[in-house]
Amino acid sequence: MKSLNRQTVSRFRKLSVPAAIMMLLSTIISGIGTFLHYREELMPSACANGWIQYDKHCYLDTNIKMSTDNAVYQCRKLRARLPRPDTRHLRVLFSIFYKDYWVSLKKTNDKWLDINNDKDIDISKLTNFKQLNSTTDSEACYIYKSGKLVKTVCKSTQSVLCVKRFYK
């Protein structure tokens, strides 16, 4: 192997500094480009586009009016559910969206159900328990209207808001 003289070594050093700088800049720019391209995978947002974030939940106004059965189906397609009647977020949702919307409360044959999962609900824990308990209808669904749960016909069409937890 032939050894290099001092001048050649000096030339390589002089050429190596700009080459190293170019390589460093190239690596940084490539890293930034990769980050921007894969931003959603690397740093997912809590809520998808169109969903509104509030207190570890994402809310979507579907801008559709439909019956309770269709509303539940629509929210399930979005991997979400109707708002529960016992959540403290109902008033906040009303102030954000400013419309009446379905909640997941239904009375069927004197049983109170969460229509998201067909499980029984203890209505004594709800804020307007006395008003709900006085309902004599065998079947009724409920909307949230101006700070209250209001009885309505299940087949009527009302606004649909869907809710889901972050990162689900």
UniProtKB/Swiss-Prot annotation:
Function: Forms a complex with OPG162 and OPG190 to coordinate the incorporation of OPG164 into wrapped enveloped virion (EV) membranes and, subsequently, the production of actin tails. Therefore plays an essential role in efficient cell-to-cell spread of viral particles.
Subcellular location(s) of the protein: Virion membrane; Host Golgi apparatus
Glycosylation sites: N133
Subunit-structure text: Interacts with protein OPG161. Interacts with protein OPG164. Interacts with protein OPG190.
Disulfide bonds: C75-C162, C141-C154
Membrane-crossing residue ranges in chain numbering: 15-37
Family: Belongs to the orthopoxvirus OPG162 protein family.
Name this polypeptide is given: Protein OPG162
Cellular-component GO terms for this entry: host cell Golgi apparatus; membrane; virion membrane
Its membrane topology: Single-pass type II membrane protein
Key word Ion transport present: no
Cited InterPro entries: C-type_lectin-like (IPR001304), C-type_lectin-like/link_sf (IPR016186), CTDL_fold (IPR016187)
Coarse class of the protein's main subcellular location: virion
Keywords: Disulfide bond, Glycoprotein, Host Golgi apparatus, Membrane, Signal-anchor, Transmembrane, Transmembrane helix, Virion
